[in-house]
Regions:
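N-terminal helix-turn-helix DNA-binding core of bacterial DNA-binding proteins
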Residues: 2-46, 66-73, 104
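DNA major-groove recognition helices of helix-turn-helix
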Residues: 54
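Residues within the DNA-recognition helix of helix-turn-helix
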Residues: 50
Length: 116
């Protein structure tokens, strides 16, 4: 049962773009253009596809405001917000790994300097 549950979770968690979109929506509602800037090197086509997929899975809601010009914002649903602790744990692990990697790199440089 656990393996099946892990596979289900990884269908979402293994997608880099969706995790970055989630990260940015945890701070509040965002327009597509704001998300594109925040996420970084993502095409509009890929961003739109991921937003639609996340909406289809109930992780975010698309809100259309009847203004001129038309304004569309995305916000996390309650289900989407349940991923916040998961993202926090991933961030903590990433920070820990980054620190370990820096120490390993520094040690390798010192070793190379000592043995040259």
């Amino acid at each position: 049962m656990l393996a099946c549950s892990v596979e289900v979770a990884l269908l979402f968690l293994a997608n880099k773009w969706q995790m970055l979109i989630l990260r940015d929506l945890l701070a509040g509602s965002r327009r597509s253009s704001d998300l594109k800037r925040a996420v970084g090197k993502i095409s509009q086509k890929v961003l739109t596809a991921n937003l639609r997929l996340m909406e289809m899975h109930g992780l975010l809601a698309r809100m259309v405001f009847a203004e001129m010009p038309l304004r569309v914002e995305y916000t996390l649903t309650d289900l989407g917000r349940t991923l916040e602790p998961v993202l926090q744990q991933l961030a903590a692990w990433g920070e820990h790994y980054r620190e370990l990697s820096c120490h390993k790199t520094e040690s390798a440089i010192e070793y190379a300097d000592d043995n040259s």
